[in-house]
Amino acid sequence: MEVKADSRYRFNRKKVRESVAKLLAEQNIKQKVELSLMVVGERKIRELEKKYFGEDKVTDVLSFPQMVGKRIPGDEAVLALGDVVVCYPQAKRQALKFNRLLDDEIEFLVNHGVLHLL
């Protein structure tokens, strides 16, 4: 899983990777997957929400399927899932609201996004 995040957005990347691996195993996904995670600010998530979903608002997580129901051409062993985008400031607010650790909230949002790709 590729993780892209500005260095100012601190979270436990290893924990997120392990959590996604566990989730995929629980969903009986045994082959390798291609999955990208982006952790962004409010401006970027608002831009994506408006461009792809027509709403001018900040949201916590977005999912973008790469190849619905298809494998990466030329590599039958890899399943192309797509991209998950998490809004760090929104995750931080939700962690406070629900009395959770920020790492736990980000993990929850990433897993939620991945489930939308399956």
Language-model region placement:
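An acidic/histidine-cluster motif and surrounding catalytic segment
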Residues: M1-E107, L115-L118
